[in-house]
């Protein structure tokens, strides 16, 4: 079985795959941890879910937090006796990356693109990842990673208001029933939610025409906040495990 780990800015997400089927999912707050803390956590979460650590044959990591990489890699070696695969510049992806400097593309965005083109071949695709940042990736039917857009995520937007103003509070991120808030909290929640929704609609329209000349596209959504937009007609498919699927596929592509 393969243990796939996605190190994000807010959390570490993980999954255990048996073939192409995901058997286990977990999450851990991604504040910088020691290798021992990470190793103990990984072994514990496996055992708690009736998955023996000894059944893990490969570990694959995708990270956008460099300060966690060394500790996590050390944990894999010390606690699993496995040198993990790291999705990074120079590995096989099956994509033709059109960034001016391909090294700049986040590993999570590459993982999403790998999984998207594998699950939906020969299609023009926009992937929206609703995480700490909300990211857009445009991938052509020929597997060309054309580029995309990045904007603050919902939580980041709300936190920016509470941290940089004297009187605005921290709020829960929800889909509000009314656009017109009748309290400060409701107004922030409305502004954050519908502001991101509006930005997404505009970006989809512009990417559709600029990257794909108006040709048919498929829109995929993933990330922790994606389900909040499930009834807005924003995307065609919600794929919660997209990045983990991409990590697994990348690891298989790079297996000697």
Curated annotation (Swiss-Prot):
Cofactor binding mode and count: A monovalent cation. Ammonium or potassium.
Keywords: ATP-binding, Coenzyme A biosynthesis, Cytoplasm, Kinase, Metal-binding, Nucleotide-binding, Potassium, Transferase
Entry annotation: catalytic residues: 108
Catalyses which reaction(s): (R)-pantothenate + ATP = (R)-4'-phosphopantothenate + ADP + H(+)
Coiled coil: none
InterPro entries for the chain: ATPase_NBD (IPR043129), Type_III_PanK (IPR004619)
EC number: 2.7.1.33
Gene Ontology molecular-function annotations: ATP binding; metal ion binding; pantothenate kinase activity
GO BP term, example: coenzyme A biosynthetic process
Positions contributing to ATP binding: 6-13, 132
GO cellular component: cytoplasm
Annotated positions binding K(+): 129
Residues bound to substrate: 99, 106-109, 184
Domain of life: Bacteria
Pfam families hit by this protein: Pan_kinase
Family, similarity comment: Belongs to the type III pantothenate kinase family.
Protein name: Type III pantothenate kinase
Organism: Legionella pneumophila (strain Corby)
């Amino acid at each position: 079985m393969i243990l796939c780990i996605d190190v994000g800015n807010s959390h570490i997400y993980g999954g255990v795959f048996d073939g192409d089927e995901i058997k286990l999912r977990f999450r851990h707050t991604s504040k910088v941890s020691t290798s021992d803390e990470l190793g103990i956590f990984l072994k514990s979460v496996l055992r708690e879910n009736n998955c023996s650590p000894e059944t893990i044959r490969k570990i694959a990591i995708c990270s956008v937090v460099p300060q966690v990489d060394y500790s996590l890699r050390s944990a894999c070696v010390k606690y699993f006796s496995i040198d993990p695969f790291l999705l990074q510049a120079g590995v096989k992806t099956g994509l033709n990356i059109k960034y001016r400097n391909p090294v700049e593309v986040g590993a999570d965005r590459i993982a999403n693109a790998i999984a998207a083109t594998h699950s939906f071949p020969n299609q023009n695709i926009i992937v929206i990842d609703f995480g700490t940042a909300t990211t857009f990736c445009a991938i052509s039917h020929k597997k060309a990673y054309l580029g995309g857009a990045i904007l603050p995520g919902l939580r980041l937007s709300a936190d920016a208001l509470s941290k940089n103003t004297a009187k605005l509070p921290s709020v829960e991120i929800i889909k509000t029933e009314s656009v017109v808030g009748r309290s400060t909290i409701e107004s922030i929640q409305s502004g954050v939610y519908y502001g991101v929704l509006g930005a997404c609609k505009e970006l989809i329209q512009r990417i559709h025409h600029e990257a794909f000349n108006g040709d048919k596209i498929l829109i995929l959504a993933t990330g922790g906040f994606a389900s909040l937009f499930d009834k807005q007609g924003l995307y065609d498919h919600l794929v919660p495990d997209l990045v983990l699927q991409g990590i697994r596929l990348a690891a298989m592509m790079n297996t000697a």
